[in-house]
């Protein structure tokens, strides 16, 4: 009996020592910190509520004092600037295209790209959305994609807006850098300012007078869409190249009345047949490999 007791005590002591040692394992302490509510939030994780410079509080003259009359004035002005409804922005990447020739005029959709656009149009039709605006990049491949989509949805082609700000480009040097794609620094300065201007033009909370949720369809390009996603969600903009989206895919972002932004779809292409899934220019049709 004494031997059994000694054995049991030794076993318990050994297990206790092992457990205490495991608790002090630095790797486990790091894992525990991920769920520790007392851990300070990183500055880069904090949400900027005035990201679009349209936070109602930023549009109203601040309180001068605590007088009831002044508070009534402030609250009355604030109410006039508060949005009531959400905005939905649906981004479509153009279909597969041929990169032949030196100008955009020769960059037409492939047969597969046209099929992709048709499926996307049918998918948008199935969603039953009533479109408030349709906007397209003025590059040929985006124009052709938009034209095919418009054959499938209920929207007057005469009301489509063509926007040069949405043209494809190099928005910002990516992190981590990649060896196969190194635009000149001047291209980032030129394209980056334009693409950022496009973001500010189309991404903002609703106007106070908007009485119903709105739906805006934008047909554009892979780099621009990925940059928009990072900016809208307040992720580091340099992370845009870590995201991959297929041709003719659907990305859906919602800007709530409060200004909070959420993503519903990111590069959704599950409605396309497997044989139509592509995300790069056909290798035999590229000017530069």
Swiss-Prot record:
Cystine pairs annotated here are none
Q: SUPFAM superfamilies, from UniProt?
A: Phosphoglycerate mutase-like (SSF53254)
Please indicate if the UniProt record lists Cytoplasm as a keyword: no
* Coiled coil (UniProt feature): none
GO annotation, biological process: positive regulation of mitochondrial fission; protein dephosphorylation
The terms under GO molecular function for this entry are: phosphoprotein phosphatase activity; protein serine/threonine phosphatase activity
| Catalytic activity from the UniProt record | O-phospho-L-seryl-[protein] + H2O = L-seryl-[protein] + phosphate; O-phospho-L-threonyl-[protein] + H2O = L-threonyl-[protein] + phosphate
- Superkingdom: Eukaryota
Q: Which UniProt keywords apply?
A: Hydrolase, Membrane, Mitochondrion, Mitochondrion outer membrane
One Gene Ontology cellular component: mitochondrial outer membrane
Protein's job = Displays phosphatase activity for serine/threonine residues, and dephosphorylates and activates Pk92B kinase. Has apparently no phosphoglycerate mutase activity.
- PANTHER family per the record? PHOSPHOGLYCERATE MUTASE-RELATED, SERINE_THREONINE-PROTEIN PHOSPHATASE PGAM5, MITOCHONDRIAL
Family per similarity comment: Belongs to the phosphoglycerate mutase family. BPG-dependent PGAM subfamily.
For this entry, the protein name equals: Serine/threonine-protein phosphatase Pgam5, mitochondrial
- Gene for this protein? Pgam5
């Amino acid at each position: 009996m004494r031997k059994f007791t000694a054995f049991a005590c030794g076993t318990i002591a050994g297990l206790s020592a092992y457990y205490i040692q495991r608790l002090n394992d630095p790797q486990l302490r790091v894992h525990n910190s991920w769920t520790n509510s007392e851990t300070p939030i990183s500055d880069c994780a904090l949400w900027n509520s005035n990201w679009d410079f349209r936070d109602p509080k930023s549009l109203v003259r601040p309180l001068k004092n605590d007088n009831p009359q002044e508070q009534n004035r402030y609250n009355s002005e604030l109410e006039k600037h508060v949005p009531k409804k959400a905005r939905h922005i649906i981004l479509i990447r153009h279909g597969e295209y041929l990169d032949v020739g030196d100008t955009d005029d020769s960059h037409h959709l492939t047969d597969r790209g046209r099929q992709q656009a048709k499926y996307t149009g049918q998918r948008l039709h199935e969603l039953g959305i009533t479109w408030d605006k349709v906007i397209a990049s003025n590059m040929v491949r985006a124009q052709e994609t938009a034209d095919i989509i418009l054959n499938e949805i209920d929207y007057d082609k005469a009301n489509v807006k063509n926007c040069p700000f949405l043209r494809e480009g190099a928005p910002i040097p990516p992190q981590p850098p990649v060896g196969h794609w190194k635009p000149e620094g001047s291209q980032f300065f030129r394209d980056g300012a334009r693409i950022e201007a496009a973001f500010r033009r189309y991404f903002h909370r609703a106007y106070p007078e908007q009485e119903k949720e709105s739906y805006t369809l934008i047909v554009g390009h892979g780099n621009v869409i990925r940059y928009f996603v990072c900016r809208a969600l307040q992720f580091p903009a340099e992370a845009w190249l870590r995201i991959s989206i297929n041709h003719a895919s659907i990305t859906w972002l919602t800007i709530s009345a409060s200004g909070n932004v959420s993503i519903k779809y990111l590069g959704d292409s599950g409605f396309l047949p497997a044989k139509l899934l592509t995300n790069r220019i056909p290798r035999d049709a590229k000017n530069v490999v």
